[in-house]
Amino acid sequence: MSGGKPRSNTRTVAMLAGVVVLMGALSWAAVPFYSWFCKVTGFAGTTNVAEAASDTVLDEKIRVRFDANADSNLGWTFRPMQREMELKIGENAIAFYEAINNTDEPVTGTASYNVAPDAAGYFFNKIECFCFTEQTLQPGERVEMPVSFFVDADLVNDRDAVIRDITLSYTFHRTDPPAPKQAALDAKTEPTVN
């Protein structure tokens, strides 16, 4: 009888180790899978990236509103240069956002984005966008950043998507750590030991 007990413990330990490995693998895969899922379905307002402008333009119009936010530690003023525009569905449009670095140091930031309502993400296509790369602004620098986009004509064929207004929203986040000014001052005042 004692021969069965160690084998049972070994099996239990192996199963528990397998569960731990499986949970770790699922945790690791969750983020890329969720990103892929959002891009494919437009879930959570995730937009598409298009290679070129739409070749189908309809007479039906849609209104796109623009929203901008900046993380408090960024030190930038960030705003849309126009609050909204009306365009034909399928028409290529360009909107501009303005960013000003209000600090006395270079600051690098990146923009996260989404559209509302969430269902519009599947039909909203960006061709070019400042959000595709990091942006570095020098002290006091002001830039106008374009986003080129269109709303896919398939929107009118989706009977579940009764969308006539879309909000494109960006939030800029700092990507480089703030300069440790106090540490630099402390280093200058510390006595050197020989």
From Swiss-Prot:
Disulfide bonds: none annotated. One of its GO terms (cellular component) is plasma membrane. It is found in: Cell inner membrane. One of its GO terms (molecular function) is copper ion binding. The chain crosses the membrane at residues 13-33. Residues 1-12 are cytoplasmic. The keyword Cell membrane applies. Keywords: Cell inner membrane, Cell membrane, Copper, Membrane, Signal-anchor, Transmembrane, Transmembrane helix. Gene3D superfamilies: Ctag/Cox11 (2.60.370.10). It is a single-pass type II membrane protein. Residues 34-194 are periplasmic. GO terms for biological process: respiratory chain complex IV assembly. Belongs to the COX11/CtaG family. Exerts its effect at some terminal stage of cytochrome c oxidase synthesis, probably by being involved in the insertion of the copper B into subunit I. This is Cytochrome c oxidase assembly protein CtaG.
